[in-house]
């Protein structure tokens, strides 16, 4: 029987080797609880130093929802790439779809966002994930995202 835990944690060094994204568009700090069922949790520490806060909004900073969706997609990409075994390991992830997206609560500087992602489908190199972004256990956003893993 396969163990439910495949990797316990992917740190920032591994994320940098896995994803092509860099500052200011690398939007996850680590991925924890990656499991054999292709689920895991991306972690983003939101600080006032985020470039988006310069214009969103200077008097009342709110972390942009679209950046949370990108954080979900990056988390899904790490989960997908780290789950592929052998020499066929993909080297790139392309974000393809966003469905059923909802923003529920604002995210502010000082919040720690957890992107709870789980695979809901796969066909060849295409993967689909459902994601719930949470702060202190409360859902702040949710979406289904699709991606293609490729060379």
From Swiss-Prot:
Keywords: Cytoplasm, Lipid A biosynthesis, Lipid biosynthesis, Lipid metabolism, Lyase. Pfam families: FabA. It catalyses: a (3R)-hydroxyacyl-[ACP] = a (2E)-enoyl-[ACP] + H2O. The keyword Transmembrane does not apply. GO terms for molecular function: (3R)-hydroxyacyl-[acyl-carrier-protein] dehydratase activity. It is an enzyme of class 4 (lyase). InterPro entries: FabA_FabZ, FabZ, HotDog_dom_sf. GO terms for biological process: fatty acid biosynthetic process; lipid A biosynthetic process. It is found in: Cytoplasm. One of its GO terms (cellular component) is membrane. Gene3D superfamilies: Hotdog Thioesterase. The active site is at residue 56. Its main location: cytoplasm. The keyword Lipid biosynthesis applies. Its EC number is 4.2.1.59. Belongs to the thioester dehydratase family. FabZ subfamily. PANTHER family: 3-HYDROXYACYL-[ACYL-CARRIER-PROTEIN] DEHYDRATASE. NCBIfam families: fabZ, PRK00006.1. Involved in unsaturated fatty acids biosynthesis. Catalyzes the dehydration of short chain beta-hydroxyacyl-ACPs and long chain saturated and unsaturated beta-hydroxyacyl-ACPs. This is 3-hydroxyacyl-[acyl-carrier-protein] dehydratase FabZ. It comes from Nitrobacter hamburgensis (strain DSM 10229 / NCIMB 13809 / X14).
């Amino acid at each position: 029987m396969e163990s439910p835990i495949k990797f316990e944690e992917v740190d920032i060094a591994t994320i940098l080797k896995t994803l092509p994204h860099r500052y200011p568009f690398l939007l996850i700090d680590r991925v924890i609880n990656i499991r054999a069922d292709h689920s895991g949790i991306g972690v983003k520490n939101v600080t006032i130093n985020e470039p988006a806060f310069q214009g969103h909004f200077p008097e009342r900073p709110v972390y942009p929802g679209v950046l949370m969706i990108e954080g979900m997609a990056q988390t899904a990409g790490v989960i997908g790439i780290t789950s592929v075994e052998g020499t066929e390991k993909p080297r790139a992830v392309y974000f393809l779809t966003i469905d059923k997206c909802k923003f529920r609560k604002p995210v502010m500087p000082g919040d720690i966002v957890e992107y709870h992602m789980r695979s809901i489908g796969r066909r060849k190199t295409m993967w689909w994930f459902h994601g719930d972004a949470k702060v202190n256990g409360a859902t702040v956003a949710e979406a289904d995202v699709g991606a293609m893993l490729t060379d």
